Amino acid sequence: MNMTKGALILSLSFLLAACSSIPQNIKGNNQPDIQKSFVAVHNQPGLYVGQQARFGGKVINVINGKTDTLLEISVLPLDSYAKPDIEANYQGRLLARQSGFLDPVNYRNHFVTILGTIQGEQPGFINKVPYNFLEVNMQGIQVWHLREVVNTTYNLWDYGYGAFWPEPGWGAPYYTNAVSQVTPELVK
């Protein structure tokens, strides 16, 4: 009996570890409001300076300096797994600063979630229009890869052409080649 309980506890712990929702590198210090509203922070950044926050979106520019790298991120709201909601509207932009070199190939045009400390705002431009960017010092980053899930139709009720036709024949359900839906999703 003890062996069964031990196996059950071990398997449940593996199951729970596999289902952990937010990657460790962007988990943060477990404060309840770490996933802040970007709009609220952007409107009054002075209230949030020094606080840890998690934001996500699409990296649209990578600026390498002598000692650090800035990621310009077009911000999207995050879901409960800290993934950017790719079907939502963009909320604004932020600059995420990381000491050292980050290769633009690994980040530009990718969806990311960052964890960092809010530093305030930094004036800049989007094209030639003045814009105040929220500035964040990065402590962690998760790059998400876009995967398209293709759902095809599976017809359970139509059994083919008849007994004298080759497969699928009678009694064999068949797949149609029609694509009914393509759903984009983000994965690690």
Curated annotation (Swiss-Prot):
Superkingdom of origin: Bacteria
TM spans (from-to): none
Topology versus the membrane: Lipid-anchor
Induction text: Induced upon starvation and slowed growth. cAMP/CRP-independent.
GO molecular function, one term: identical protein binding
A Pfam short name: Slp
Positions of S-diacylglycerol cysteine lipidation: 19
Lipid moiety-binding region (N-palmitoyl cysteine): 19
Subunit structure comment from the entry: Forms homooligomers.
Name of the protein in its database record: Outer membrane protein Slp
The organism of origin for this protein: Escherichia coli (strain K12)
Organism ancestry: Bacteria, Pseudomonadati, Pseudomonadota, Gammaproteobacteria, Enterobacterales
Gene: slp
